[in-house]
Swiss-Prot record:
Residues reported in the UniProt entry to bind Zn(2+) 1: 66, 68, 158, 325
Free-text function comment from the UniProt entry: Catalyzes the second step of the reductive pyrimidine degradation, the reversible hydrolytic ring opening of dihydropyrimidines. Can catalyze the ring opening of 5,6-dihydrouracil to N-carbamyl-alanine and of 5,6-dihydrothymine to N-carbamyl-amino isobutyrate.
Protein name as it appears in the record: Dihydropyrimidinase
Disulfide bridge map: none
PANTHER family: COLLAPSIN RESPONSE MEDIATOR PROTEIN (PTHR11647:SF1), HYDRANTOINASE/DIHYDROPYRIMIDINASE FAMILY MEMBER (PTHR11647)
Gene Ontology process terms (BP): pyrimidine nucleobase catabolic process
Required cofactor(s): Zn(2+)
SUPFAM superfamilies reported in the protein's UniProt record: Composite domain of metallo-dependent hydrolases, Metallo-dependent hydrolases
Lineage of the organism: Eukaryota, Amoebozoa, Evosea, Eumycetozoa, Dictyostelia
Enzyme class, spelled out: hydrolase
Keywords recorded for this protein, A-Z: Hydrolase, Metal-binding, Zinc
Length: 503
């Protein structure tokens, strides 16, 4: 891998700047990693790096809200570590990722956080942040959540409603976690599947002799995702706190989110590249390896309408920002479940191809405008997780994370050319038109001419303050609701014996 001089200074000439609210032709000057000037005809200073972006778009660096790099999971570890994973990210135009700290049940949140941060700090090639999963509940967890928010830069906590006997929390635990999130100004996130019913469905499939990858989707149908999504939103609304549903994979779950949003509930939905780019019919492929490669949770749905409908929701703003749930396992790891689909490590790729998949299926189909694309792949995530406009916008004072995007250049996605460590790509053979030709992180070119020039460990941890825009109006809303909750003044109840004895 090439090493570059990290000056953080670059001048981009003749491009079209695209933010989520407007686009315009301009030059962009980045100095010391920060955008210094945006105007036409900027004269380059002596010795400065100049890049010509004629006929190209200048986009805010992509933000992937959902990755799992080097995750210990289901008896193995995902093969895209923080080095390889962030190389793949920048090769596709993503310059910021938010990974998940996932403590084991009973483990200290702070201990797990410190481990994840150490792994990341040593390897990341772009800036990053960390969500933290809550896999159990106690007074210790409550105290450690406060420390994470106030001292460690965390403003989001995830609950699993699935993975029974592992990560799954009960509804009562989730209620208390949501209350604590509200107190701390952190957004509650939810993996929404009915874990008890999934557990029973898995037993049923195995009893019927369905042991292959198709059993994965059959045991956790769309209805279980939709039901859990509704339940999570109802619980969050009872607490009056914002909730963010991760990896929305089904029409049913998206419908539920849309319904509650129309009723004024503060809920956010995250579709992922897999669900927007392919369908789950691959799990019925006769090649076991091929079928197993598509196993993730919630499943990619086999209904071929799903990816189009999810894109429609994204275009309307009923779903918010696109993540990937990038969690990759090679063939020998997936083969742990060759005789039992419940043992197939769940996870697929996506961090490298996310932006091109959204462009191909959104912009190129006429469903998304350029500005809506930026909203879906960058700016809305920055707002929700309270790092806007530092991230998610091209403007003076913002971080110099910029993608030079060629809307007319094509490529065919393949495991043979991708930058992941995994030996399979779920988007294999898909031709996309619209790709990142140059990726700039903090003013430094890290991807250009189909070559990476990253510096391992050069990325920075970005703390995310609490009480972001998702909490706007929450206090007043809660106050108004509570004013409607009044007791009825009435005389003490007296039965006939009491009445007679008082005479």
């Amino acid at each position: 891998m090439l090493r570059v001089d990290q000056t953080g200074t670059i001048l981009i000439k003749n491009g079209t700047v695209v933010n989520d609210d407007r686009y315009f032709k301009s030059d962009v000057l980045v100095e010391n990693g920060i955008i210094k000037e945006i105007s036409k005809n900027i004269e380059p200073k002596e010795g400065i790096k100049v890049v010509d972006a004629t006929d190209k778009l200048l986009l805010p660096g992509g933000i992937d809200t959902h990755t799992h790099f080097q995750l210990p999971f289901m008896g193995t570890v995902s093969v895209d570590d923080f080095d390889i994973g962030t190389q793949a990210a920048v090769a596709g135009g993503t310059t910021f990722i938010i990974d998940f700290v996932i403590p084991t049940r009973g483990q200290s949140l702070l201990e797990a956080y410190d481990q994840w941060k150490k792994w990341a700090d040593e390897k990341v090639n772009c800036d990053y942040s960390l969500h933290v999963a809550i896999t159990w509940w106690s007074e210790q967890v409550s105290r450690e959540m406060e420390i994470l928010v106030k001292e460690r830069g965390v403003n989001s906590f995830k609950c699993f409603m699935a993975y029974k006997n592992s990560f799954m929390v009960t509804d009562q635990e989730m209620y208390h976690i949501f209350k604590r999130c509200k107190e701390l100004g952190a957004i509650a996130q939810v993996h929404a599947e009915n874990g008890d019913m999934v557990f029973e469905g898995q037993k049923k499939m195995l009893e019927m002799g369905i042991t292959g990858p198709e059993g994965h989707e059959l045991s956790r149908p769309e209805a279980l995702e939709a039901e859990a999504t509704n339940r999570a939103i109802v619980i969050a609304d009872s607490v009056c706190t914002p909730v963010y549903i991760v990896h929305v994979q089904s029409i049913g779950a998206a419908d539920v989110i849309c319904k509650h949003r129309k009723e004024g509930v503060r809920v956010y939905g995250e579709p992922i590249a897999a669900g927007l780019g392919v369908d789950g019919s691959h799990m019925w492929n006769h090649d076991w390896r091929h079928a197993a490669a598509f196993v993730m949770g919630p499943p990619i749905r086999p209904d071929p309408r799903t990816k189009g409908v999810l894109m429609d929701y994204l275009a309307r703003g009923d779903l918010d920002c696109v993540g990937t749930d990038n969690c990759t396992f090679c063939a020998d790891q997936k083969a742990m479940g060759k005789d039992d689909f419940t043992k197939i490590p769940n996870g697929v790729n996506g961090v490298e191809d996310r932006m091109s998949i959204v462009w191909e299926n959104g912009v190129n189909t006429g469903k998304l405008t350029w500005c809506q694309f930026v909203r879906a792949t960058s700016s809305e995530a920055a707002r929700i997780f309270n790092i806007y406009p530092r991230k998610g916008r091209i403007d003076v004072g913002c971080d110099g994370d910029i993608v030079i995007w060629d809307p007319n250049q094509s490529k065919t996605i393949s495991k043979d050319t991708h930058h992941h460590a995994v030996d399979f790509n779920i988007f294999e053979g898909i031709k996309v038109t619209g790709i990142a030709v140059t990726t700039i992180v903090a003013g430094n070119i890290v991807w250009s001419d189909n070559k990476l020039s990253c510096v391992k460990g050069s990325g920075r941890f970005v703390p995310r303050p609490p009480f972001g825009p998702v909490f706007d109006g929450i206090e007043q809303r809660d106050k108004v609701r509570n004013e409607l909750l009044r007791k009825v003044d009435r005389k003490p109840y007296e039965d006939d014996n009491t009445k007679n004895s008082s005479k």
